[in-house]
């Protein structure tokens, strides 16, 4: 027959362990986003990736419609100067940021973000493809990429983009002299068209020297892989919380041992 102190001790240990598990499951995650340019050598490059982990409420553009100011700030020059604040206004609890740096063919870059998977289940992104006047990659629907499942684990580990998934914002007339990466991007002429898929115009830049120093050669076909986003996660260290809970478990263990020592044989 179990003694009362044993039952109580087991309850205390179980409660402390449950608290430790609860703290771990409720904690935010460190999400590392790695991006790779899969385009052929001397083909297209990409501006920094603008991104957000979110609740699925920020819709920056729609196919067949006039491009919004936020997506134009990504597609024309790549800065995201209007995209980032518009995202924050539409979803104040989102985690928003960038994977910085020009991404030339074959290059990989990464950045790490602290994300609450219970609140921000979706992933939204945008990056200018260059050389171009207004080409970009991004997700049309804000709920297209659900990154986390209900348990807080990764629902997807990567996003792969092909040439035929590159967008034309329809906001600027095609003109190599005014194109980013090969011309003067400030010499813009409005096009007043709509967002559509388009990669064929890249061939119009063949033979031009890019800002990265290579002579451009598109080489793209509809099914050419051009971009990949990889995700990996790790727990966020919380030394104070876990130290306190661990100390509690150790204390319970010490009490159990002391009581056992005092029990008559």
What is the role of each PLM region?
Residues 3, 27, 114-116, 219-221:
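A general structural signal for short secondary-structure junctions and capping/turn motifs
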Residues 9, 13, 17-28, 228-251:
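Short, threonine-centered small-residue motifs that mark membrane-proximal processing/anchoring sites
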Residues 254-265:
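C-terminal membrane-anchoring or membrane-association module
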Residues 156-233:
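Extracellular low-complexity, O-glycosylation-prone Ser/Thr/Pro/Gly-rich "stalks"
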Residues 1-7, 263-265:
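N-terminal secretory signal peptides that target proteins for export/translocation
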Residues 28-30, 38-151:
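Structured domain cores in non-transmembrane regions
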